[in-house]
Amino acid sequence: MIMSQKPFDLEGYRKYITEKVREAFNVAQEARAKGLDVSDHVEIPLASDMAERIEALIGIKGIAQEIRDLSSRMSREEVSLEMSRRIAAMFKDNRKEALDKAIRVGLAILTEGILVAPLEGIADVYIGKNQDGSEYVGISYAGPIRGAGGTAQALSVLIGDVVRRELGISRFQPTEDEIERYIEEIESYDRIKHLQYMPTPDEIKLVVRNSPICIDGEGSEEEEVSGHRDMERIKTNRIRGGMCLVLCEGLVQKARKILKYTSSMHLDDWNFLANLGGKAEGKSSKKSDKFLKDIVAGRPVFSHPSRPGGFRLRYGRSRVSGLAAASLNPATMYIMGKFIAIGSQIKVELPGKAAAVTPCDTIDGPTVLLKNGDHVKINDIEKAREVYDDVVEITDAGEILIAYGDFLENNYPLPTPSFTVEWWEQYLPDGVNAKDIDQFSAVEISRKYGIPLHPYYDYYWHDISFEDLEFLVKNAEQWSITEDGMRVPYPAFDVFIRLGIEFRRSGDYLIIRDYYPLLISLGYDVRNGKIVNVKKYERKGSVMETVNYLSGLIIKPRAPTRVGSRLGRPEKAGDRKMKPMVHSLFPVESYGEARRSIIGANKNSEGSYKAEVFFYRCNSCGFETPTPVCPRCGGHCSPLGEKTGSIDLESILNRAESILGISLDSLKEFKGVKKLMSKEKVAEPIEKGILRAVHDISVNKDGTCRFDMSDIPITHFRYREIGIDERTLADLGYEVRDVNELFPQDVIIPRKAAKYLFNVSRFIDDLLVKYYNMPPFYSLESEEDLIGHLIIGLAPHTSGGVVGRIIGFSDVNAFYAHPFFHAAKRRNCDGDEDSVMLLMDGFLNFSARYLPSTRGGLMDAPLVLSVLINPDEIDKEALNVDTLSRYPVLFYEAAERHASPAEIEDTMMTMKVRIKKTGTYMGSSYTMDTSDINSGVLVSSYKTLGTMDEKINEQLGLAKKLRAVDADDVAARVISTHFLPDMYGNFRKFFSQEFRCTKCNAKYRRIPLSGRCQKCGSTSLTLTIHKGSVVKYLNETLKIAENYRLPDYLKARIDNLARTIKETFPDTEEEEKPEPREVKITGLDMY
């Protein structure tokens, strides 16, 4: 796939991608045309832009050009509403169809034709009757509407209203009972699922009473409402999750945004929205502990909200941050118990809810206190490894680098900035050397030019009290200057820790090497080797003001904003396996037993069994079979349809062995599925499953092979760090230089992914050669040969894939790609994960006919493929990524007054502004370099620690080390949000559980009176919830309660539960991992 050539420009790159996609498509089309698959054509339509994606997704021919024409002069939202009007007019003879098509097209435009929400998020659109006999429009929402996001959810209701008006249908008139039902239902849903924003009862009443459209939904939850049941116009008593999402996270939470559109379109019926959403959309710069909600055992807290010693906010963007990802020094990752790895998700206090972690070794690492009493800063990972076992306390977590664009995206007021070198350098007059600044020149430059003191010699004065400051001022004259530095008596220890001053412990003294700026800040100087007072102490308005007064210098706050955080999900990079692992989408019913073995099914059924499957009839011999080619005579078959019939598995397997030249005896395992979940019950050609078993790869629900990874961004790369040489770099169309800007569809995959995709490529080649009788497509000799080949990226909640090109490999367990690539998949980098597949695998093996017919079955399937990325058609978050090489002083001044980030967007040159001003998104930069994108912890210790006991010990042990963490609070939260709910829940379920047959997996609410499985006759029936599941956290809970200071009410809950469990299960001992215990049952012996 690699070709030697001149460097690409953007147009040449896009042309190259298009040609390679078409080349692969044509090969797959030739293979499919042979009639050996469930369809005779490639089932992933190619789309060059959003308009084509929408046309392919919704299936209305000819609308793509209309969408393009409107998009050239209207905003996305305006296009959505206008196209909805046009679609309604197109189908005006059938009002229900007009409503349905118009709303789905409008929603598809809002979601860029990528999400499945327009297909599955709207369960139904209907016309109902009001009590006065007039008609109204109802939209029934389903769970997948969540993926559309709040704004699109709300606008879909608005679209319904616009179309309703066009069709002359009246507005919805709810009854008081119906309004009360909405309130009860939403409150219940929030208790079960936790809404992002929970409206007040008055807000719910306001929306339901005034919305011209009935916001309805299908019953999505098992729980039913207790009151307001069996209502005429609400068809279910179950909680309607889709309705709750649209009303709360859509209309109420996004009320201000929706008002902009209703006002411009003079839709006065929606003016009531002005009374909503005030609390929902406002962001506050005050500290918040929301990120501490639902702490999980084993996943540590790194800092409580805004607490001294926590992560210090540093503004800027590394080449691997932005789009919600934040960067940490690799040393920080290591010192934090190795819990934070590259790609790990951390829940954060600001500006959003979470961030994926990437490395940046040009920002500050942590400051730690060692066993020998030394207080040192650790800025490189090698030093972190060296001192790791000697760390007594982590007094400062180091810096967290968060990009301006993330504050802009979240509309979060800019918090007070830390004073940093890149800010300080902009105060420096031209001609003054900014390098090699020592403690004496730092003070001299500040005095001479009237600029702030260099941040390296600035301390956390804002973290100490007046009493602390006065203690230092009072005792400074007793300190002494030596050859090693300044000797300070030990009592200053605590204050120095809070100030972040590095020192070396020597007996009863602390030795400070860079002492001069400290003395100056306290109103002292050094004369003839002696410390002398030069400014009389006088208390000012704050400690910072007093230090500025004493020093006579400008001293900026070093770290005024601290960011609380905890570990969310650990990083992920692994091949996707269905549970249990499956090689072939071929039904074995109960004959394959618990392991779903196809070979076992052949033996147990003696070669033939009945199954519900799509059948074909041979055109030559008339034999009926679930395969498109006759297993008896090899003739082509015609489709019959779905039915319950007899599968001649032995003939099918014999023919497959003959065609492929593979003996089934050589396979370690060969697994199918118990039943087919698709609408038509179409089975996959079994030859594909055999070849997957040979290459040890698993099939996904849609016939493809996937590799799942956490998403992290990258805009610039060094060729050496991605495992390629200069020749390969040039062959890929890049200039040979140290750092290159990444083309938007180029990706860097983990080496684990390379190994898996290499195996998939060999499977594809075998499939082409042995099954389709065609030449191989890949012919790879090693994993490195994957470079230059194309993949499809696909996010779980979407239905549109994006083409990418592999240009290298990383050592991390995450997926490096351009922000535009992630955004084209409707993903950001706050801990999201998604998958890739080889392009030819998708073309050759995907079929929509394999997809489950259940709600959400169309999600995570490449129903359409975007060949090229257009910045105008991707999620707008990627356009908020900033591109400057240095943030200007204007930015820092805006942050000092907590300005809205939108005020300075033009100055900050976001991708959006860059495209507007220059016509291209290429040529971007970053503020902080990273020497190697692989530098840092590669696997979180959360994944390497064995038992839960070990994880909790490490979690709480780290909490004790961190100055910014309250270990007692962490212990209490772990128990109250994880252990107790788990034990209470399993205790209740234990007494209302099902029983399971270990042979065929059949489940029973009660044990059959015969004591045998009614499906297979086995007597091996077992519990589904074991005693060990109930008591597994009990001992750990009691241990924590004994060693940490917990609230009295929590101790009482623990004591009550422990007593109940021990009375129910005498002689209880903790069972961390209970093994399923087979229960042999005969008759009523169980009782």
From Swiss-Prot:
Coiled-coil stretches noted in the UniProt entry, renumbered to this chain: none
GO BP of this protein: DNA catabolic process; DNA-templated DNA replication
InterPro entries: PolC_DP2 (IPR004475), PolC_DP2_cat_dom (IPR056172), PolC_DP2_central_dom (IPR056171), PolC_DP2_N (IPR016033)
GO molecular-function term, one example from the UniProt record: DNA-directed DNA polymerase activity
Enzyme Commission number: 2.7.7.7, 3.1.11.1
Enzymatic reactions: DNA(n) + a 2'-deoxyribonucleoside 5'-triphosphate = DNA(n+1) + diphosphate; Exonucleolytic cleavage in the 3'- to 5'-direction to yield nucleoside 5'-phosphates
Disulfide bridge map: none
Record's keyword terms, sorted: DNA replication, DNA-binding, DNA-directed DNA polymerase, Exonuclease, Hydrolase, Multifunctional enzyme, Nuclease, Nucleotidyltransferase, Transferase
Its biological purpose: Possesses two activities: a DNA synthesis (polymerase) and an exonucleolytic activity that degrades single-stranded DNA in the 3'- to 5'-direction. Has a template-primer preference which is characteristic of a replicative DNA polymerase.
Family as reported in the entry's similarity comment: Belongs to the archaeal DNA polymerase II family.
Cited PANTHER family: DNA POLYMERASE II LARGE SUBUNIT
Complex and partners: Heterodimer of a large subunit and a small subunit.
Name this polypeptide is given: DNA polymerase II large subunit
Provenance organism: Thermoplasma acidophilum (strain ATCC 25905 / DSM 1728 / JCM 9062 / NBRC 15155 / AMRC-C165)
Source organism phylogeny: Archaea, Methanobacteriati, Thermoplasmatota, Thermoplasmata, Thermoplasmatales
